[in-house]
């Protein structure tokens, strides 16, 4: 019975131990979620304490990305499903080196995508549980403004998220350092609270047990001392006798270093550095937001520039094509008069038939033919003589008449055109590459369809596209209808009357073009005069008094030059207006004269005396002013055919000189006016309208650059680390007091135990410490030099930006004049290119290249100026951003119709075009 009782008692004890172990296991620790949320609470609190200056305020410190972000994680962060894995590598999770792996990897499930599986839903794309990578190409972001690009970067930018996480990690490290100096649950020996139990079965059938439990607290003092108090209890069970012995004990320990690791400068250093690191990272995050805006803005401006270069190149190609077509038309003209040398053949004069003498002559040296030549004429000429010399000369004469000539000018223009087309292809490739790079920087896939809003190109549309299109239509009507009225063969043809229906359609078309020229040419150019007039009126008394939205003058001489140009432009416009009114009246007259159903109705309308002729007295008085070919004047009487021929000739001259030529003049005038009106955002400091001095902006930069503040503080960090390294060279001298006191009822005062200990270590084996100290001295000197270099680099960058801004201001004034000059040069060269006798196409190709280069340089210099303005503000560290990350500069706020006092929210949604939407206008 006794043995059985012992076994039962042992079994109960073992059962108790198992139950106790199970209970203890339930106290193994708090959940992952608890610790994560606690870490977030402490960390965000630490970050918030450092955001105590407006210069490094942050609109967001939460690590959780925007729900629309591509890398937003929709799953429980503490119970993440397994992401997609590489199939070959995944095998080793289930079997490694012949051993079965962990079998419960998939208990939380598996996701089908690494990126946010729902992020495409914001763009109207439902992937139905498929990897969103397959839907990237369906995303369409059209006409995205710069503020919207910044929004996209805050939603999707990986670099922004990484910088935010760096700030969080530094603040997380700070929580550890603060905790180290607080009350910790560590006992006298640095152990955490514990319970330890042991059960023993003896060979004689007896059993006993032993358990130990301890709970203590300690605190590290700023001076380096450490205080610890611990309550421990030891219990012994004797199961055979049914008794137990308990021995509770209260212990304490006080340790104070006196040399090594002693003093506040050593003990508080980790906490000091951690506090400073959070401040550094907060400033770095604020600095990153500034550089992020500058980076996105620079990319946006460069895309605008590349697009403008493409538009300029397209216009250049259009002009080259026009000139090439004109040159081919000149080349295709059949010569009316040709000659060929034939010496000493006097008998030919008697052989020429009388009916050919009007067209074929010989002066004993040259064979001459004037007019058209038919195949019958060719055979008759060949039959006049059997002389080999004569027949060879006649064959050459016929060849000159029938040859298909391609002039040198045509080849030059064609070569220039082909080069321009090749350049355009390269420019389009560069634009596409730049767009893909921007998408990557924003955090978007490169195959997303993203186009930027091109409203920023409006100032560089120096010639209205409507006016350019109108000029093209004027050429088209001549190509389609004009040649039907009088084929341009270069022959002395009989005055064949035009087809009435074609003539009527031609005049109707010219009237329509005239109306469009009034609306898209005269009226538009009239409006282009107003900004210049307004600018001159604003600055009449003070040349510096231009408004922020207007062009400013660098000197009074610059304004005076604009006054002169404006007066010339206004006089040119007034002449063009008068010419337009004259041509318009003439067209109206022609339209009234032929506004009948058939050409026979013209006589019925105009022939008042019914004599079958149209007399000058029966025509409007303005008829005598109708432009005519050569030196022709109005006749006294006209047959119907002669009248229609004169209407045809007059309408064609009106098209050439009073519509097409006037449109070209308006283009040149418009280019000059618009280029004068282009404004730049002048570099000024707040509450000032003057260009600041270079030393002033450098001083501002050295005072406000956040990264320089960090660099300056890091010099002090290196200096403090010298002291820490020096402390490690000292001897170890620690004073320790320890004691314990039994707490059982029978304990007496003699049961307590008190100990005092003095610990000393000689500093003899200190090579590592010596080297560390010497290295800290070098590190400090390096940090000093690094700060000086940072200071000098900032100063250098600001000075370079300042000089570049001044140079760009000057260059832009030169660019204005260059565009004016190039437009006039092309206009003159275009007129000369229509001459029958040319020396190649050097003038026209040179003029086109000059105009293209002037337009490109203007756009490039403007973008370079604005880029440097961005850089100098960010280099000075005074770029203030709104909550979305957009600079509170009026130029950038107006891109989204915001004002200086406009309220905005972070991460506004850019305009989204759904996959099945209607085409954009």
Residue ranges and their predicted role:
Residues 1-11:
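N-terminal secretory signal peptides that target proteins for export/translocation
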Residues 18-26:
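Hydrophobic core
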Residues 29-31:
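N-terminal Sec signal peptide cleavage junction
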Residues 33, 37-74, 78-79, 345-387, ...:
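Acidic, low-complexity, intrinsically disordered peripheral segments
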Residues 33, 132-136, 140-152, 156-160, ...:
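Small/polar-residue-enriched beta-strand and adjacent coil segments characteristic
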Residues 67-152, 691-694:
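Regulatory alphaC helix of protein kinase catalytic domains
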Residues 163, 167-174, 288-313, 323, ...:
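Amphipathic alpha-helical coiled-coil segments
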Residues 171-174, 179, 185-188, 192, ...:
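Hydrophobic, small-residue-rich alpha-helical packing segments that form membrane-like cores
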